[in-house]
Amino acid sequence: MPKRTDIKKILIIGSGPIVIGQAAEFDYSGTQACKALKQEGYEVILVNSNPATIMTDPEMADKTYIEPLTADILEEIIKKERPDALLPTLGGQTGLNLAVELYENGVLERYGVELIGANYEAIKKGEDRELFKETMESIGLKVPESAVVRSVEEGLKAVEKIGFPVILRPAFTLGGTGSSVAYNVEEFKEKLKVALETSPIHEVLLDKSLIGWKEIEFEVVRDKADNVIIVCAIENFDPMGVHTGDSITVAPTQTLTDKEYQMLRDAAIAVIRAIGVDTGGSNIQFALSPESGDFYVIEMNPRVSRSSALASKATGFPIAKVAAKLAVGYTLDELKNDITKFTPASFEPSIDYVVVKIPRFDFAKFPEADRTLTTMMKSVGEVMAIGRTFKEALLKAVRSLELDRYGLAFPKLTNVDKVELERNLINPNDQRLWYIAEAFRRGYSVDEVYELTKIDRWFLYNIEEIVKFEEVLRKEELTPEILRQAKEMGYSDWEIAKIKGITEEEVRKLRKEEGIVPTFKGVDTCAGEFVAYTPYYYSSYERPYYTVDGQEILDED
């Protein structure tokens, strides 16, 4: 289908001030959308209350309003500008909530403004917990045993049936705002009061706790012709119970069997169709039992989300740009891939590398804050790293956090007693990665750490191997082969030097003398299957050749 010609002017709602759970990711998405729509010849009107963004730069939109993001202000702007359409799916939760309010107040109908990207029914089904539950059950997918309550009295009746622990999720909120886990009645009463106040419609979903299950996310895009693609599947390092924004995440998924992956992929496609998002992207989250393989649908964001920015950068597929073009009538097969200039956007990205995201916390600025990670997001940012292996990407990401830590060593933890160590493994906080490494240094087995953390054993084995290699570096002579192994694993020159008690310059000199230098690999959305005109690159110490019958064959990638 060609682009729509019946709409000329499009209003985009920005995400407003930077808050926990809604930060630069939405500026990144909104900027992409403004550029894409202007490229197609549409007049773009942008409303955002935050002038410190790229999207509010003068050249991004035809007209930019720096105004408070309220329904009354938006009505005045709509009255003045008379846009043909409103695109609310790029402004995070703020954009969605305002679109719903404008629709329900009759403002959109009064001024003849059409919702594009996601219609009112799709937004309600995705965001209203009760409607979402009914929709999932209608297509045969399970959601955790739950109840929607609007008062403390209703909550007390419902929790008798659901039992403890119970997760509280306020409707129409972002970043897990107001959500929590309650383990007894007294705690439940206090947390439910907070959750009810947090929800703009005073509605809270009480969920059966699935703490300890794996959390898997799918970034899905659908068009008007019902073409659906999975842009990326993202696995959470931390099990259920930690907000996905505070969890270390990995793409592609590392621990799923093919059967589990295909099962969740089919479910994700069924969810986006049932909710009715037909011109854009959605983020769909699942809980998967590590024992039985059973799964539940946790939630769905019928909009470009925080994870969409991560998936875009991880794969090279510009989700926000594509979503904006789908909203004005294009189909996936009509849009060309920017990197290959040949394949259509309906061609699912292939990932032949590993991407790791680690959240960045800043508890030093909030000394009174509880560092325990729960269902309410606390991180203030995140870093992303790309490597050929999980170990390499993880260590790259750790160095990018700017915490003056170059690996999994954290000397302060050597004096922590066993009780405190295990308490911090059971109750995850922002230091959990280093506590896990410390446990392995003290001789804990993978199974013992798994019982305390419920983090999948595959991830734990990888961390254990990184820690064990510290001992190899410490005790063995730094031969070219050991140095190469360390670099392939992701160790930095600085960290190797510190372990060996030599200078970073000495390590670098030895490395270069032995020809141990980085090779650069491309992110091209297709794993090298097609010519890439505008790929981006990541460095790796993977050997740039393969051995065939004892002969070294150069890798031409």
UniProtKB/Swiss-Prot annotation:
Identify the pathway: Amino-acid biosynthesis; L-arginine biosynthesis; carbamoyl phosphate from bicarbonate: step 1/1; Pyrimidine metabolism; UMP biosynthesis via de novo pathway; (S)-dihydroorotate from bicarbonate: step 1/3
EC annotation from Swiss-Prot or TrEMBL: 6.3.4.16, 6.3.5.5
Q: Single GO molecular-function term? A: metal ion binding
Query: By its UniProt entry, which InterPro entries does this protein fall under?
Result: ATP-grasp, CarbamoylP_synth_lsu_oligo, CarbamoylP_synth_lsu_oligo_sf, CbamoylP_synth_lsu-like_ATP-bd, CbamoylP_synth_lsu_CPSase_dom, PreATP-grasp_dom_sf
Where does the chain bind ATP? 129, 169, 175-176, 208, 210, 215, 241-243, 285, 299
Residues binding Mg(2+) 2 are: 299, 301
What does the entry's cofactor note say about binding and number? Binds 2 Mg(2+) or Mn(2+) ions per subunit.
Question: Taking every annotated instance into account, which residue ranges of this chain make up the domain ATP-grasp?
Answer: 133-328
SMART domains of this UniProt entry?
CPSase_L_D3
**Reaction catalysed by this enzyme:** hydrogencarbonate + L-glutamine + 2 ATP + H2O = carbamoyl phosphate + L-glutamate + 2 ADP + phosphate + 2 H(+); hydrogencarbonate + NH4(+) + 2 ATP = carbamoyl phosphate + 2 ADP + phosphate + 2 H(+)
Region span, Oligomerization domain: 403-553
Enumerate the residues binding Mg(2+) 1: 285, 299
Q: List the disulfide bonds.
A: none
Does the UniProt entry include the keyword Metal-binding?
yes
Q: Where is this region: Carboxyphosphate synthetic domain?
A: 1-402
GO BP = 'de novo' UMP biosynthetic process; L-arginine biosynthetic process
Keyword annotations for this protein, in alphabetical order, are: Amino-acid biosynthesis, Arginine biosynthesis, ATP-binding, Ligase, Magnesium, Manganese, Metal-binding, Nucleotide-binding, Pyrimidine biosynthesis
- Is Thylakoid among this UniProt entry's keywords? no
Q: List residues binding Mn(2+) 1.
A: 285, 299
Instruction: Share what the entry says about its subunit structure, partners included.
Output: Composed of two chains; the small (or glutamine) chain promotes the hydrolysis of glutamine to ammonia, which is used by the large (or ammonia) chain to synthesize carbamoyl phosphate. Tetramer of heterodimers (alpha,beta)4.
The record's function comment reads: Large subunit of the glutamine-dependent carbamoyl phosphate synthetase (CPSase). CPSase catalyzes the formation of carbamoyl phosphate from the ammonia moiety of glutamine, carbonate, and phosphate donated by ATP, constituting the first step of 2 biosynthetic pathways, one leading to arginine and/or urea and the other to pyrimidine nucleotides.
Domain notes per entry: Corresponds to the N-terminal section.
This protein's name:
Carbamoyl phosphate synthase large chain, N-terminal section
In its UniProt entry, the species of origin is given as Aquifex aeolicus (strain VF5)
Chain's gene name? carB1
